[in-house]
A protein has these predicted regions:
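Generic marker of residues within folded, mature protein domains
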Residues: 2, 13-15, 35, 42, ...
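Juxtacatalytic substrate-recognition/specificity segment
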Residues: 23-162, 169, 186-187
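Acidic/His/Gly-enriched intrinsically disordered linker/tail segments
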Residues: 34, 108-276
């Protein structure tokens, strides 16, 4: 059963990160400019698997997020073949400007790329006057929590050790998170087609360097198309098991990792150039 509670501002920042415990939340000076902060009175809405933290005028959005997250979680756990280990925290801002100003001086740089932010296993989302976009942010946040917990654990010490041992390309893990959080769509297909037909990329490495998220998402969708959907998460599992992408690809694709990337480029060229 869901429940509401109020928390103090100090408690809220402890929940977000121990690093912000000494932060000033009323005003910060940058040279001659002074930035005024809103003062938020924080509450949280709790469900079986999520705590949604919100402030004034955010209660209905918090309910929407909590219900959406609970609805999406079982399907995403099934696709990831991994379950949420503990209740996840979602920090909700009513608008992007509030999210920006609340973190000035805290050493966190929010970039306006329309995506979910993850801070120490806590999802930070903001409302863009579009509930579908908010739901997508939540899906991507769940995908990121599930993926990173599975790959690296959810303890800070465990994460650091596992990241050192498991040296996967960032485009690969970010692409899997995007794949898990957002179904392939006409918009994504058009974006990929535009990149492939641009003629800018003769090798996948150049494509992944320039456009890591679409390249990574497209790679996993390619694995689904070419090697079956059930083998997408299995390939990631093999990569973590062997700690070696070549061994993982040889096991599933019967090819080395670099050969799979060449196959990806050839596959996309054939698919999109035949439409010209």
């Amino acid at each position: 059963m869901a429940k509401f509670s109020r928390i103090s501002l100090i408690s809220f920042f402890i929940i977000i990160s121990a690093a912000v415990a000494n932060a000033q939340v009323n005003a910060v000076e940058f040279g001659k400019n002074r930035v005024q902060f809103k003062k938020f009175k924080w509450y949280y809405y709790q469900t079986k698997n999520f705590n949604v933290y919100y402030y004034q005028n955010g209660e209905e959005l918090a309910k929407f997020i909590a219900q959406s997250a609970e609805k999406e979680l079982p399907q995403m756990e099934s696709a990831a073949e991994y379950s949420l280990q503990r209740r996840a925290n979602i920090i909700l801002y009513n608008e992007y400007a509030d999210m920006q100003q609340s973190n000035i001086g805290l050493g966190i740089d929010w970039q306006n790329n329309g995506g979910t932010k993850l801070v120490n296993n806590k999802m930070v989302v903001y409302f863009e006057a579009d509930h579908q976009k908010l739901r997508l942010q939540v899906r991507k946040g769940i995908a990121q929590i599930l993926t990173e917990n599975r790959l690296f654990g959810d303890d800070i010490g465990e994460i650091a050790g596992n990241q050192a041992l498991l040296d996967l390309p960032k485009w690969l893990t970010d692409g899997y998170i995007s794949y898990l959080g957002q179904n392939w769509s006409t918009e994504l297909d058009d974006e990929l087609k535009s990149e492939i037909l641009s003629g800018n990329y003769t090798k996948f490495s150049k494509f992944a360097f320039a456009r890591p998220q679409i390249a990574g998402h497209a790679f996993w969708y390619f694995i689904e198309e070419k090697y079956k959907k059930e083998n997408v998460t299995y390939l990631l599992y093999l990569a973590t098991l062997y700690k070696n992408l070549n061994k993982a690809c040889l096991k599933e694709c019967k090819k080395k990792f670099k050969e799979v990337l060449v196959e990806f480029m050839e596959y996309q060229d054939e698919k999109y150039y035949r439409d010209i």
